[in-house]
């Protein structure tokens, strides 16, 4: 809750402040200053306007509530910000919920239950009748994750909920202070203005958003005008030209990164450590060189100039017998005189050395000495200048010679006690050479005599500090000039930095490689066989199964072993638990529908006792009235899986049967559905859950579709718990096919619930821009029809199947691909449908027909399904894969998605398929295995993966929507794709983006890899198709990693986190061309001899390369023991230039190509186009959106089975109530199954059903009696209860012989004498645990018991809405969340025991009202 704007002192003493949602633009109040005169008086208060039905509150606070804004406070708050609540790392309830929050849309959907009005159907903004304020005005729908904006809706449209532009109404409402628009409207208005306005001096240079990135791309390509792009590069439209400019921007970043990698690899060392000369250890100079003043000079080919009679210009002193100078130290022949020693070494009196004052010609005798320091002092010819090279000519010639190397000495040699060496700074001096000074010829300091003989104070040490402290630095510099023999073995700071960068990079790269390798080994040895494993499965059985899988994957058409595919006629009940003692008796209640599962129910009701309830021996069959139950009936919402149908296997009654007294035909005949097994039927050791097998089809062939559907239909998962759903993306024909893809699929169906010729197309909101946002589709429901040539008759199971065929809107009848909206749209058809079912939101006519189709072919309401298996239409699934994937889901509720292993069926077809075998293998068993250890698989392949629709939460029956989460559906259903980033995410890499969305929305849940689940597929066999496929994959990978790198909540921290791994993957993917080029370069210079290259061998790089390329082979050997894959690895290594150079480079340059290229070819298409283009204007008037209950009311009214008034006020009279002749005063806002076919007074009446309590019968909220019902559009309020309903009562209600003392408006309650003994009055339970209490507003709280039969009130009651329900229960009041609880928990109604003989209604609330579905959290500020 954000604070109100404060003008004076307030205090927070009242317990229930008004609840509101903070807007994104809300500004926290400034705290009062110390000079504020109101500070001294705490009696002044500020009245806050009542909101949401709460009373007005007076708020004030004391002196210590705020710190002075102008003072410096110790907490570190800025002077102008004041006190603000900071985000906490350990208190998630304190995090600020803004439109960028990962659960923003989910909380918005949950908070909408608090709004006191229904969504508008006219486009007018609704107002609160109490204070003229729109409830929920502070609710901000927020921006899309990808900043979705659009303004393409026709102004004359009737459904303005799709409006995103700046309409006149929105502008007017924005200008009116008291009618502030919602956050969604304001966001869309501002965004619409932003796209149209010009950007500084650049003008309107590109369509779409003009952010810093687009400005950079435009400036980078400003020298290339649009007409050049259109003529040369073929980009005609402004959107295509924008994508081309963005592509150039991304290519520039790739080049920057590759240049940076190349500089770090090669240039950095040369830059910071490139001036280092060749270094030779002291004493290692060869006979072809001389050592002079610490440097080695190569004189092997040098000839001494003509000098007297000794040298004639063709001889070298190195090889003359009188010199033999090769390998000697000739420093005394080229002495550094009169520099640092000037004034220190002076001529002695009577010296024979040439001198001029203090300047001398030489100091030492000009003789050679050994480079190892073994020569004794030789003072011969000290006055002879022949060898001293003192002339300027000799000195200039010597200076022209470049030294070959530096002579260096290690510290071990410096400390050699046989020598008298010392180090000054970096120079090594031989103090024994001072003995060559003749004191009769030169004068020198006494310090030289101190050190010329070995002195432990100086010898073998670094004397730099000692010399500096003693003030003898000039002496040391002089010694460096005359007796330096080399340099100490040191390394420059640049070389240190170079090596540091090298080894740090090595550590990170090898660390990542070894950690990934180690985790993959851990996964392969300890985790992989546990995932999806069945209890009691031995190691030998697992190895046998692995061998059978390898044989199975050799051919795409090879069937799996017969024993793994169950027989169609099998009725094995091996998993049924048997009890020694009987569980029923003749006194047991006849409740075949009320046997609950051991797992929590999929419906929202009350959490009650979890003990199993057996069926009575007298109640094995249900009467026909119970068989006419429509979807959403209370008969179907008490268990998760085992009691979804109103009959048992031993019941021979058809649901479409009619009773003698019930002549109304059942609208949903279910006589041919697959029976549901017993609740304790666990053939695989875990409770069964309902699964949808989603197959997205586009232009596949008959063989490909048949292969996929056969494999799904013959899986060993029970048919009662699986549904095959095929969504055909448009009326398209594959290349060479004579039939449209929907026609092919429809030919594979039988026993359609509605004849194919009678199926009509229904509208829905598609993922597109322009008029294509309106799409139409047909829904066919039936059973899968096998081909006896592909599946033997004994294996042909009866599997329900639904086909959704997109046929397009009337404007695209003549298009090449009518109805085609992309694979993402096909997935959203299902995801959006599941979300609307879970949240009881308005749905389109297609989704309503979809709901009924699922019900009619399965007998299972769609909200019962928990998982969805996504399979491409060219994939064949191993028979037990679905079972093993569901086992992972059931055993670990934290898993929200998983994928199996995809194997190649055409391994040896061409060289193109051969190079892909190991790539597929290592991507699963190395990359995904490593990510699975941490529960963060970043990419679940769309060809074979499973997602969790909803997850159980706790032990009280709560559910958390996962795939059906509004945040995931909202972001995944992005319809305006106007940037290169969004196009690569949503048009090419939709499967990977869905994985990214789930990780961003639920970073603490798991995405895992299940190697036990296996499928096989056909990979591209030509390089052209492979190039097109990998272009899509690589580009989508880059953009998805960019999204995933922003997720901060992944496991780990800093460098030891999945976020850092994602960053390394991103950089590694972008620099792949440079990496393979550098690899080839290193291999080449390693092969070429060092004498030719002149460079040392890169051993570190070679070791790194060996680990990177060799560890996958080791992984194969120690985990799978499939030696054949080592051969495939060698093929892969040979093809590395293709994978790392050709494919990435091609992909980056074609990043603005958003088509599927050669992967999917269709007939009749000249040039393929992407799905993101905008054509025309979207007119939403063609789309009708209502809640399921409203559709159902209208259907029943149109078929004449119920009056129009019955949709507002019904008396529910149960067919099998204890006293069928006494009508029940159960008031319902909907026409339920019991009012549709009550069947009172029939011979089948019994005590099966519990007395149901509806929301309407318990709601304590009523509108004003003066409400004008005529002005309420579409979702009109019910008429007063005293009004005539006009509904014909059932025969039993009029012929029962009992007077109708409980008609509408009656105030008389039944007495104990006229109530059946089996009737148990409803009472409000007293909750002992605070966590069990439903969260109720104060005005709803009741403490006294309430009888189940209530008299009809004088005016219509508004029903309350609770959790997820498939009925329209009307508006509700705002509920106050517990201040200490960050998560809003809405308890389901406690299921009463069978002895109370009651059945929970789908709209039952048990007398309590909540406003948020399970797991929803109110905003916390």
UniProtKB/Swiss-Prot annotation:
Which residue ranges have biased composition labelled Basic and acidic residues? Answer: 647-656
Q: List the Extracellular topological domains.
A: 234-247, 527-1067, 1119-1122
Q: Where is the composition biased (Polar residues)?
A: 1-16, 38-56, 595-604, 636-645, 1256-1271, 1291-1314, 1396-1406
* Pfam families to which the protein is assigned, alphabetical: Chitin_synth_2 (PF03142), CHS4 (PF22997)
Q: Could you tell me the membrane topology recorded for this protein?
A: Multi-pass membrane protein
Q: Which regions are flagged for Basic residues bias? A: 1385-1394
Q: Give the catalysed reaction(s), semicolon-separated.
A: [(1->4)-N-acetyl-beta-D-glucosaminyl](n) + UDP-N-acetyl-alpha-D-glucosamine = [(1->4)-N-acetyl-beta-D-glucosaminyl](n+1) + UDP + H(+)
Residue ranges spanning the membrane: these are 213-233, 248-268, 506-526, 1068-1088, 1098-1118, 1123-1143
Q: Where is the composition biased (Low complexity)?
A: 124-133
Q: Which family does it belong to?
A: Belongs to the chitin synthase family. Class IV subfamily.
Task performed by this protein: Polymerizes chitin, a structural polymer of the cell wall and septum, by transferring the sugar moiety of UDP-GlcNAc to the non-reducing end of the growing chitin polymer. Activated by CSR2, it produces chitin that is deacetyled to chitosan, which is required to maintain cell wall integrity. Conversion of chitin to chitosan offers an advantage during infection, as chitosan is less readily detected by host immunosurveillance mechanisms.
Q: What name goes with this protein?
A: Chitin synthase 3
Protein species of origin:
Cryptococcus neoformans var. grubii serotype A (strain H99 / ATCC 208821 / CBS 10515 / FGSC 9487) (Filobasidiella neoformans var. grubii)
């Amino acid at each position: 809750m954000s604070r109100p704007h404060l003008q004076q002192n307030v205090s927070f003493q009242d317990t229930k402040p008004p609840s509101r949602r903070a807007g994104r633009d809300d500004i926290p109040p400034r705290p009062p200053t110390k000079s504020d005169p109101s500070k001294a008086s705490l009696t002044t208060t500020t009245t806050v306007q009542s909101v949401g039905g709460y009373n007005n509150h007076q708020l004030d606070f004391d002196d210590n509530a705020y710190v002075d804004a102008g003072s410096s406070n110790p907490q570190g708050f800025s002077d102008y910000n004041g006190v603000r609540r900071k985000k906490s790392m350990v208190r998630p309830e304190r995090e600020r919920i803004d439109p960028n929050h990962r659960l923003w849309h989910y909380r918005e959907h949950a908070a909408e239950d608090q709004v006191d009005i229904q969504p508008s159907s006219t486009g007018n903004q609704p107002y609160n009748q109490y204070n003229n304020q729109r409830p929920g005005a502070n609710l901000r729908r927020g921006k899309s994750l990808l900043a979705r904006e659009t303004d393409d809706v026709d102004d004359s449209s009737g459904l303005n909920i799709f409006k995103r532009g700046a309409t006149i109404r929105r502008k007017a409402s924005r200008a009116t202070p008291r009618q502030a628009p919602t956050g969604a409207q304001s966001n869309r208005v501002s965004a619409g203005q932003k796209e149209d306005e010009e950007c500084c001096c650049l003008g309107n240079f590109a369509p779409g958003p003009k952010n810093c990135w687009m400005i950079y791309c435009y400036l980078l390509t400003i020298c290339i005008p649009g007409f050049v792009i259109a003529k040369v590069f073929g980009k005609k439209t402004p959107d295509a030209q924008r994508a081309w400019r963005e592509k150039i921007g991304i290519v520039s970043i790739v080049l920057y990164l590759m240049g940076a990698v190349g500089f770090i690899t090669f240039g950095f060392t040369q830059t910071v450590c490139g001036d280092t000369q060749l270094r030779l250890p002291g004493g290692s100079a060869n006979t072809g060189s001389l050592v002079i003043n610490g440097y080695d000079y190569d004189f092997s080919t040098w000839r001494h100039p003509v000098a007297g009679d000794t040298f004639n210009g063709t001889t070298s002193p190195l090889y003359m017998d009188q010199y033999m100078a090769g390998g000697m130290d000739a420093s005394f022949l080229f002495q550094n005189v009169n520099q640092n020693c000037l004034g220190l070494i002076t001529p002695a009196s009577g010296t024979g050395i040439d001198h001029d004052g203090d300047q001398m010609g030489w100091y030492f005798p000009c003789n050679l000495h050994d480079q190892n320091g073994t020569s004794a002092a030789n003072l011969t010819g000290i006055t002879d200048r022949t060898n001293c090279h003192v002339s300027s000519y000799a000195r200039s010639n010597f200076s022209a010679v470049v030294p070959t190397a530096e002579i260096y000495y290690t510290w071990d040699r410096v400390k050699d006690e046989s020598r008298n060496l010392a180090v000054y700074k970096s120079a090594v001096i031989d103090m024994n050479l001072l003995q060559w000074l003749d004191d009769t010829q030169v004068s020198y300091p006494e310090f030289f005599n101190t050190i010329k003989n070995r002195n432990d104070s100086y010898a073998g040490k670094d004397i730099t500090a000692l010399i500096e402290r003693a003030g003898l630095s000039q002496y040391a510099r002089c010694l460096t000039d005359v007796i330096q023999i080399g340099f100490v073995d040191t390394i420059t700071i640049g070389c240190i930095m170079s090596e540091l960068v090298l080894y740090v990079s090595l550590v990170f790269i090898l660390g990542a490689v070894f950690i990934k390798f180690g985790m993959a080994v851990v996964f392969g040895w300890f985790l992989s066989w546990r995932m999806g494993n069945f209890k009691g499965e031995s190691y030998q059985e697992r190895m046998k199964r692995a061998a059978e899988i390898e044989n199975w994957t050799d051919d795409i058409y090879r069937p799996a072993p017969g024993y793994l595919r169950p027989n169609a006629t099998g009725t094995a009940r091996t998993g049924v638990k048997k009890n020694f003692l009987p569980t029923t008796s003749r006194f047991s209640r006849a409740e075949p529908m009320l046997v609950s599962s051991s797992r929590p129910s999929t419906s929202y009701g009350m959490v009650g006792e979890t003990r199993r309830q057996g069926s009575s021996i007298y109640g094995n069959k249900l009467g026909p009235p119970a068989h006419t139950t429509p979807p959403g009936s209370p008969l179907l919402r008490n268990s998760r899986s085992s009691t979804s149908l109103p009959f048992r296997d031993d019941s021979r009654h058809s649901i479409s049967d009619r009773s003698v007294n019930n002549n109304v035909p059942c609208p949903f005949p279910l006589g041919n559905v697959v029976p549901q097994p017993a609740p304790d039927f666990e053939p695989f050791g875990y409770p069964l859950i309902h699964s949808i097998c989603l197959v997205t089809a586009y232009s596949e062939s008959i063989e490909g579709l048949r292969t996929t559907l056969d494999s799904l239909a013959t899986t060993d998962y029970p048919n009662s718990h699986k549904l095959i759903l095929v969504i055909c993306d448009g009326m398209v024909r594959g290349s060479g096919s004579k039939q449209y893809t929907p026609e092919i699929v429809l030919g594979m169906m039988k026993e359609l619930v509605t004849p194919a010729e009678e199926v009509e197309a229904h509208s829905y909101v598609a993922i597109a821009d322009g008029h294509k946002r309106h799409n139409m589709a047909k829904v066919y429901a039936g059973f899968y029809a096998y081909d006896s040539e592909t599946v033997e008759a004994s294996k042909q199971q009866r599997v329900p199947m639904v086909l959704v065929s997109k046929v397009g809107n009337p404007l695209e009848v003549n298009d090449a691909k009518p109805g085609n909206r992309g694979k993402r749209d096909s997935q959203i058809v299902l995801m959006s449908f599941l979300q609307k079912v879970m949240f009881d939101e308005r749905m389109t006519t297609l989704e309503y027909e979809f709901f009924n189709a699922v019900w009619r072919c399965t007998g299972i309401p769609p909200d019962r399904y928990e998982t969805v298996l996504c399979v491409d239409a060219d994939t064949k699934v191993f028979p037990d894969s679905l079972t093993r994937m569901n086992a992972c889901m059931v055993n670990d509720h934290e898993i929200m998605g998983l994928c199996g292993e995809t194997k190649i069926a055409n391994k040896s077809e061409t060289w193109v398929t051969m190079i892909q075998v190991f790539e597929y293998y290592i991507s699963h068993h190395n990359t995904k295995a490593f990510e699975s250890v941490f529960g963060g698989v970043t990419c679940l392949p769309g060809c074979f993966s499973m997602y969790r629709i909803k997850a159980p939460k706790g032990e009280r029956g709560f559910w958390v929507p996962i795939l059906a989460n509004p945040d995931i559906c909202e972001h995944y259903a992005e319809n305006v794709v106007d940037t290169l980033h969004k196009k690569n995410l949503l048009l090419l890499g939709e499967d990977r983006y869905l994985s990214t969305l789930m990780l961003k929305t639920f970073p603490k849940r798991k995405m895992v890899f299940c190697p036990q689940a296996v499928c096989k597929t056909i990979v591209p066999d030509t390089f052209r198709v492979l190039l097109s496929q990998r272009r899509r994959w690589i580009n989508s990978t880059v953009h998805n990693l960019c999204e995933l790198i922003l997720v901060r909540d992944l496991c780990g921290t800093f460098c030891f986190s999945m976020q850092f791994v994602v960053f390394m993957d991103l950089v590694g993917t972008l620099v792949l061309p440079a990496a393979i080029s550098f690899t080839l370069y290193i291999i080449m210079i390693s092969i070429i001899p060092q004498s030719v290259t002149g460079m040392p061998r890169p051993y570190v790089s070679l070791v790194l390369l060996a680990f990177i390329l060799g560890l996958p082979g080791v992984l194969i050997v120690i985990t799978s023991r499939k030696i054949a894959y080592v051969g495939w690895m060698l093929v892969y290594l040979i093809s590395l230039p293709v994978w790392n150079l050709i494919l990435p480079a091609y992909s980056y340059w074609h990043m603005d190509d958003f088509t599927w290229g050669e992967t999917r070819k269709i007939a009749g298409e000249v040039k393929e186009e992407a799905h993101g283009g905008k054509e025309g204007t979207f007119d939403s008037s063609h789309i009708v959106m209502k809640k399921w209950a409203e559709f159902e009311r209208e259907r029943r009214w149109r078929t004449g089975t119920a009056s129009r008034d019955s949709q507002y006020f019904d008396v529910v009279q149960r067919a099998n109530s204890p006293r069928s002749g006494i009508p029940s005063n159960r008031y319902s806002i909907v026409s339920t199954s019991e009012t549709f076919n009550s069947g009172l007074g029939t011979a089948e009446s019994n005590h099966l059903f519990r007395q149901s309590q509806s929301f309407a019968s318990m709601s304590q909220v009523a509108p004003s009696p003066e409400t004008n019902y005529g002005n309420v559009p579409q979702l009109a309020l019910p008429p007063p209860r005293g009004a005539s309903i006009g509904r014909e009562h059932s025969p039993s209600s009029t012929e029962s012989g009992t007077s109708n003392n409980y008609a509408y408006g009656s105030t008389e309650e039944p007495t104990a004498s006229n109530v059946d003994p089996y009737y148990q009055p409803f009472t409000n339970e007293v909750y002992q645990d605070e966590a069990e209490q439903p969260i109720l507003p104060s005005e709803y709280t009741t403490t006294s018991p309430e009888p189940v039969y209530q008299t009809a009130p004088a005016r219509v009651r508004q029903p309350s809405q609770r959790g997820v329900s498939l009925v329209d229960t009307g508006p509700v009041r705002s509920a106050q969340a517990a201040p200490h609880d960050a998560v809003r928990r809405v308890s389901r109604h406690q299921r009463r025991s069978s002895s109370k003989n009651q059945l929970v209604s789908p709209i039952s609330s048990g007398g309590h009202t909540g406003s948020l579905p399970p797991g929803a959290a109110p905003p916390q500020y």
